[in-house]
């Protein structure tokens, strides 16, 4: 699978922190696409069994297409990660977000998504200290990814 290829070929040679983060985040992208498929199938089943119109359920459908929401569902419903590893990754993300004047959220998944957005939209503005913080994020992120790969299941 593509994930096997990432671990066998890409991750060992990816040394730059930015590239490493995006390689790890690709695993999240793969998982949230599966989350979307699962949620959408359940949504269609619910529509078939419901007297409510699609118009009445448009908000739920809108939530499904938001990446941030799928990341939340992934961490809350589809994987089991030790609280300690969640806390470590969350703290690393918080430090990086704070250093760059970004909003800090209450949930680890939200903070991880915010780091992703920071890197995609503002990487060119990161200072040297932020790059060191990103290395810390990556170390914690890899531990979380390993747990995710071992525990991912469709609900």
Place the predicted regions along the sequence by residue.
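Amphipathic, oligomerization/interface secondary-structure segments
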Residues: 1-155
């Amino acid at each position: 699978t593509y994930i096997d290829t990432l671990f066998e070929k890409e991750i060992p040679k990816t040394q730059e922190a930015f590239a490493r983060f995006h390689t790890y985040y690709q695993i999240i992208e793969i998982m949230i696409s599966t989350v979307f498929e699962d949620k959408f199938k359940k949504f269609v089943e619910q529509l078939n069994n419901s007297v409510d119109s699609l118009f009445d359920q448009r908000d739920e459908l809108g939530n499904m297409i938001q990446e941030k929401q799928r990341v939340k569902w992934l961490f809350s419903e589809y994987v089991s990660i030790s609280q300690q590893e969640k806390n470590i990754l969350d703290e690393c993300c918080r430090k990086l977000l704070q250093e760059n004047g970004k909003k800090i959220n209450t949930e680890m998944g939200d903070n991880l998504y915010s780091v992703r957005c920071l890197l995609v939209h503002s990487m060119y503005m990161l200072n040297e200290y932020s790059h060191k913080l990103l290395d810390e994020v990556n170390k914690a992120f890899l531990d979380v990814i390993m747990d995710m790969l071992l525990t991912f299941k469709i609900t």
